[in-house]
């Protein structure tokens, strides 16, 4: 059967229309699939695991926010110090954590320098605890025994057969002592002056005298063939990491010196240094920042400097509640120094976890010993 020419033309046009429609449909399908793929790529499905991970990340960020558990206590201590016109540096430890290491007030009026954690102070009689530690070290080495009479080492010492080393350490020797001058002096001459001063009673009764520790300082030198300064540097300062501690005149040229002042009619007046530092041998010519005496305490109580047995003997209270260099105040141990107008306090709790260290270059009316008791109350 033959189609006419017109029918053939209509059939070709119909095929072309079908082809065009198929092409359009194919394009639409391609665009739809591609758009869906792009949407999935731009907006991926969030799984349950990923939601959990995001929640954990948020929680972790919250956990990293540090809250100071001692902030309230620190604020109360600062307020107490300021209310009592404390001028110096305070170093406070609670549960082996330093919660305050801060200066309050003036260090050097002339140059307008304020006290801070690096300020240096002459520590006065607080030095006796350091010297007593050195004596206990020598006992552990077998070079002496605290029960030995002093004439075993210094044959010319008055009443030397009855006065024991422990009597000097505990201020029960009965010596008269000497009158300090203001000129340089050697440790040998200091000992001769003390011997010449004689005794005023038999040993055993409490009588606090610096010269007891001058004798101990000289004993350390004789037994070790070192100066007291060199022995302490090698066997106490270095192992305890007391890097800013010194002895003698270096204090007065150190830029961190906290100058001693006294108040007169509300005016600060520089307190005069009346004696050459060598006159304070063994008993009061050491200087340091508060942090260094804390490092000493930790080295002392942790066994780094002496044994536990030696520490127990050193802290055992005798006459005047005084052991060897420390007073026993029932809930804490304390050593104290007062010289010129410096007042320094070093104390730590019986469990060795808390410490209150107050170094002043201007003595307050209340005094650091009373402040120490108040601050211990705040630490409870």
Which role does the model predict for each range below?
Residues 67-71, 87, 117, 121, ...:
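Soluble non-cytosolic domains of exported or imported proteins
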């Amino acid at each position: 059967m033959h189609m006419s020419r017109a029918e053939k033309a209509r059939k070709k046009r119909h095929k072309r229309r079908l082809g065009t429609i198929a092409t359009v449909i194919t394009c639409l399908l391609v665009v739809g699939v591609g758009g869906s793929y792009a949407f999935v790529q731009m907006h991926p499905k969030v799984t349950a695991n990923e939601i959990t991970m995001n929640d954990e990340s948020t929680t972790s960020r919250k956990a990293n926010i540090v809250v100071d558990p001692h902030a309230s206590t620190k604020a109360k201590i600062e307020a107490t110090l300021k209310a009592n016109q404390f001028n110096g540096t305070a170093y406070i430890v609670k549960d082996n954590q330093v919660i305050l290491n801060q200066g309050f007030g003036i260090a050097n009026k002339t140059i307008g320098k304020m006290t801070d954690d690096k300020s240096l102070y002459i520590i006065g009689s607080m030095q006796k605890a350091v010297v007593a530690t050195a004596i206990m070290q020598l006992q552990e080495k077998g070079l002496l025994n605290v029960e030995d009479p002093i004439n075993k080492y210094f044959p010319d010492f008055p009443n030397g057969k009855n006065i024991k080393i422990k009597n000097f350490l505990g201020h029960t020797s009965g010596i008269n002592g000497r009158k300090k001058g203001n000129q340089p002096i050697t440790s040998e001459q200091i000992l001769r002056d003390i011997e010449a001063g004689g005794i005023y009673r038999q040993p055993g009764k409490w009588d606090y005298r610096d010269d007891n520790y001058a004798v101990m300082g000289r004993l350390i030198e004789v037994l070790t063939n070192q100066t007291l300064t060199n022995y302490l540097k090698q066997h106490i300062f270095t192992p305890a990491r007391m890097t800013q501690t010194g002895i003698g005149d270096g204090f007065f040229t150190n830029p961190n010196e906290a100058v001693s002042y006294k108040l007169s009619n509300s005016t600060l007046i520089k307190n005069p240094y009346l004696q050459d530092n060598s006159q304070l041998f063994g008993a009061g010519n050491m200087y340091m920042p508060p942090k260094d005496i804390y490092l000493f305490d930790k080295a002392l109580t942790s066994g780094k400097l002496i044994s536990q047995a030696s520490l127990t003997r050193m802290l055992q209270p005798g006459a005047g509640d005084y052991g060897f260099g420390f007073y026993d105040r029932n809930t804490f141990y304390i050593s104290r120094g007062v010289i010129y107008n410096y007042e320094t306090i070093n104390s730590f709790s019986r469990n060795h976890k808390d410490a209150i260290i107050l170094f002043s270059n201007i003595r307050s009316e209340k005094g650091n010993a009373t402040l120490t008791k108040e601050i211990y109350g705040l630490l409870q």
